[in-house]
């Protein structure tokens, strides 16, 4: 009798302005059965456009500094959108941004992850 491994896939939208980070995320998502990257993008405008266009990832993983915005205006815009579901939001940031964590968490983010980080 063979043992089947059941893996629940999580759909996630990733936004990071660093091309190397996006490449690493793409590779990780391609090799990990638990992650389905619905989008890997570099700007807040692209995040908003995709959400307004009907993309419904379960999780948003957002860098605190994107190519066109910082996390605060982006979180406010996401919060103001009339979307019928609430994705889980994770924000990645540099340790120097630690004083901003409380503000980030009050603007709908559920978790923060400090960079640099490593993927298993």
What annotation goes with each model-predicted range?
Residues 72-85:
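Short amphipathic alpha-helix used as the core "switch/output" element in two-component signaling
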Residues 118:
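Receiver (REC) domain switch/active-site region of two-component response regulators
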Residues 60, 85-98, 109:
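A short, hydrophobic beta-strand element within the central beta-sheet of small alpha/beta folds
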Residues 40-59:
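Acidic, metal-coordinating helix/loop segments flanking the phosphotransfer/catalytic sites
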Residues 43, 70-73:
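Acidic catalytic/metal-coordinating carboxylates
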Residues 115:
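A Lys-centered signature of the CheY-like receiver
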Residues 8-21, 25-29, 60-61:
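Conserved acidic segment of CheY-like receiver
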Residues 72-73, 95-112:
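Alpha4 helix (beta4-alpha4-beta5 surface) of REC/receiver domains from two-component response regulators
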């Amino acid at each position: 009798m063979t043992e089947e491994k059941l893996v629940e896939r999580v759909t996630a939208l990733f936004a990071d302005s660093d091309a190397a980070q996006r490449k690493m995320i793409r590779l990780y998502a391609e090799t990990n059965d638990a992650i389905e990257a619905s989008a890997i993008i570099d700007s807040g405008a692209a995040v908003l456009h995709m959400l307004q266009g009907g993309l419904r990832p379960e999780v948003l993983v957002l860098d605190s500094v994107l190519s066109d915005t910082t996390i605060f205006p982006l979180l406010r815009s996401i919060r103001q959108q009339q979307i019928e579901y609430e994705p889980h939001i994770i924000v990645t940031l540099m340790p120097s941004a630690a004083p901003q964590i409380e503000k980030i968490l009050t603007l709908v983010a559920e978790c923060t992850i400090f960079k640099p980080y490593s993927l298993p």
